Amino acid sequence: MDFEKYGAYILEETAALLNIDSPSGMTHKAAEHVKARFEALGYPCEITRKHGVFVNLGGEDKENGLLLEVHMDTLGGMIATIKPNGRLKITAIGGLNANNVETENCRVITREGDVYEGVAQLVNASIHVNGEYNDTKRTFDTVEVLLDEDVKSAEDVKKLGVRVGDYVCFDPRVRITKSGYIKSRFLDDKLSVGILLGYAKYLKDEGITPKRAVYAHITSYEEVGHGGCTNVPDGVTEAIVVDMGCVGEGLECDERMVSICAKDRSGPFDYDVTNGLIAAAKKMGANYAVDVYPFYSSDVAKTLTAGYDVRHGLIGAGVYASHGYERSHVDGALATLKVLAGYIE
């Protein structure tokens, strides 16, 4: 089977989704987009109450169903204070880190739908003026958002319709290189949505009906901890998360591999499911690594704590610099696709 033909499709779908702002709690536009993309492939799907997307990928045995969980929500910011000088103090949505957004362009989206450009900068950001520039710890007390508007006071900002509670969305800066790398904010976990679309297209192209019912839940609150709590159909016995694979010191995975997670901070994954994923990687010739993630949790942890009696596992394309300006590779995406194809028969 020539899986490589799905590489360009996966990256194109990923890039399109990356360019739609979708911080946790504001995923409605992304949900409409994802729903339309699955429907274009011929799959029935619906938008959930929490603005996720639920997809029925078909399959025979509905008493031994498999749920695939990925998330389309991302990190972001929200205005916490409009300062007297017209600058904005923000609060993080999810694990947004001030170090990683300093100097990044952003958009403030008001509750009425107006959009204003801005940039995140250190307070007193001119190094020729600020003698403490190098020594200042970057937090959201010291990194602020400047609107690209002629505002000098809180009143000026409010005249624009900007208010506390408005979302701040950071530029993903999507780049796809000739060598197959994809660089962007929020590859966690929009790359996995692209991979899942690639898997859905593979099933259609090959005319495959899985032996077991397969569902997908593209969640909308993973980054804040309650994405996978709901939408587990009756008859589902396994839930497998497709989320970013960790890349870093002490781990074996890199961006051109699929990572199979044996344990994260929530504990070990199901023994048989993990073994099955490893066996699928070997069978399909996928370049893989088995790793332990020390500071990681996923949708399926919330599925379990919500009380669902399912076996669980986790795989994902290797992604470097998580929660920052992330990097992965088409080979890692294709390796993940191969494992899905090999595991779900």
Ranges and model annotations:
Residues 1-345:
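N-terminal hydrophobic/helix-forming segments and targeting peptides
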